[in-house]
């Protein structure tokens, strides 16, 4: 399905042994691009209404998850850490060393993982209608059995505009969803098994905007409050709407997101004493503490980058091993088939003589 905006372009990029379908909308500004991480089973077209409504100064990068849309289906299920490293390589291949990251629903967990593994490559983080993971989230209220069996509208499951204006949901998502019976959808589900960021939230150091709807039946508003309470530099905004307002009513959230991305650095004043070049002895206790904290943060960031590179190398080695194993298995099958054919021919010759 082509991207509607003529200024956008699509391409296939290779990262970590797999190929990803990517759509890029160039921006007129000079800031980092905004990387969008979709919900489960959604092609990159799902957030087209949001992209169309977003400030044209912001460059936007979207992708299909492995096994979704035009991206290659991996040979084995993957973990969020694997995909976070693939995205890092993808951004590098596209010429970007840093990006702002927005994740919605399933993509919110991926966005958190990306921020944790790539602290210097994620400038700001936006989490929309998401949680810490399927096993540590506050679950939705179960539907009464009768209503569960005879849902009058699909929008009842999504809440907000999807419920009051089902045509908006159809326009936004009908052609962007993949079948929940597909292997790509299954891999996205298995990636979430056992995944949680709950104990790691204090390690997310980026400025973070948490957006959660007060009529979201899938991920209740309490989950957004948990994220905002656990992430040190998070701002919470509870909007009146459901799970997919970003696609069905982008005008509701786009101004908040644009303002958040354009705001000056949260810690600009705090970083100033460390940049003056004065000796620590000439600084006050608060300035010395800030300088020490800055140095510790830089060291932790470097260590995290080193770990991410090591994990990426391990993933590449795993991919190479899988390829070699598949080639060896194919060669073994061929050898067995040739041996069986030779044995059959020998038996036939013996019988003929």
What are these regions (language model features)?
Residues 103, 107, 111:
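Gly/Ala-rich beta-loop-alpha elbow adjacent to hydrolase catalytic centers
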